[in-house]
Amino acid sequence: MIRNVAIVSLSNGIIGEPSVQFEVEIGLSRLKEYGLNVRFMPHALKGLDYVRAHPEKRAEDLLQAFRDPKIDMILCAIGGDDTYRLLPYLFDHNELADAVTDKVFLGFSDTTINHLMLHKVGLRTFYGQAFFSDICELGPQMHPYTRKYFEELISTGGIREITPSDVWYEERESFTPDQIGKQLPAKPDHGFELLQGPSVFSGRILGGCIDSLYDFFDGERYEDMPVLCRKYRLFPDAADWKGRILLLESSEERPTPEKYRQALEYLKGTGVFDAVSGVLAGKPMNETYAEEYRQLLVKVIDRPNLPIVFNLNIGHAMPRCIMPFGVEATMDAEKQVIRFGT
C-alpha cells in the first residue's frame, strides 16, 4: 500500500504558478483524504520559468525521490515538452541507475521520455495519469473511471486489469475558479475497437505519447532532442521491442493526420512494427481525427496480421486508466479486457 507520495515537475513547472494554486489545493486535499503523506520535491513548485531554466534541478528532484527510502510513489505533476533535457544529468555518470529503487512511478504525455529513461535502467512504471491533470480535476470529484484506477494503484501497488469506460468527456474549456465543482457532461463511449488482426494477444506494454516519440526523430520542436536521444540510446532497439505491445496515444496538440502519419512512418523505420506483438492506440482528445487515425494505423503499419486495437481510455482524452509498463499483459478485444500478470 502506498503511504508517502513525492510530486515532481520533470517537464512543465505550471504547478508553481500563483494562478493555479486553487487547483493544486484541490489535488492536495484529495490525496490527503486517501491518508497519503504528500511531499513536493524541492523544485517542483518553483514555477514555469525556473523549472524550464533548470533541467539539472528537475533531475536532482527525481534522483532524491528515488533515494529516499520513505517515498513509495513518485507522481509527476504534469507533462510538458522538454524533459529530454534531463538526460545528461541522469546518465552521464550512471546517476539514475545508481539511484533507482523499486517505487511506483506514474505520469504520462511528455513523461513518456521519463518512462523510457526508467525502462533503460530496468524499472517497471505506470502510464496514464498525473497530479495536475487528474487529481486536481475541477469537478466535484475525480472522474469515476480515473479515480477507480488511481485508488487501485495506491491500495495495491499495481493494476490487475483494464476495461473500457462507459463514457468520455470533452476537454474542459475553462480552468478558472468559477469552474470548481462543475461536472463535465458525459458522452457514451463504445469500448475497445479491434481494427485488424487476432483479438487476443500478449506482451509487455511500452510506449506512450506519439508526439513525444515523434520528437525523438524530428528536431522541429527542439533541434538537440534527436541528438541527445541518439547519444543516450533512449529509444529501445528492435530486439528490445521483440514481443512487446506498443502503446500510442496522441497529445492535446491534436496532431493533424499528416503529422500522425509522419510519426508512424518514423516509428516504422525503426523496425518496431516488425517486432511487436500488437499495437494499442488511445482515444484522441475530443475524438479529433479519430477516423483518420484509425485509417492511418492500418495503412502505414501495413501488417495485416498485426493486432491493432483503438479507442483505449489512455492518454489525453478523459477519463484515463493507468497502464502498467513492463508487466506481462493479455489483451482480449472480444471480451473487452486487458489482464496483467505479476
Regions found by a protein language model. Give the residues of each.
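Conserved anion/nucleotide-ligand pocket segment
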Residues: F126-D211
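ATP/nucleoside-binding phosphotransfer catalytic cores, i.e., glycine-rich phosphate-binding loops
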Residues: K259, E265-K268, G278-T342
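Charged helix-capping and loop-helix junction motifs
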Residues: Q21-V24, P55-A59, D92, Y260-Y266, ...
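Long, hydrophobic/aromatic-enriched structural stretches that serve as scaffold segments
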Residues: R67-F91
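Oxyanion-binding "anion nests"
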Residues: I205-S251, P255-P257
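ATP/NTP phosphate-donor binding region
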Residues: M1-K70
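Short, acidic/small-residue loops that bind anionic groups at enzyme active sites
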Residues: D92-K120, R124-F132, P307-I308
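Structural motif
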Residues: M73-L75, L106, I245-E249, L280
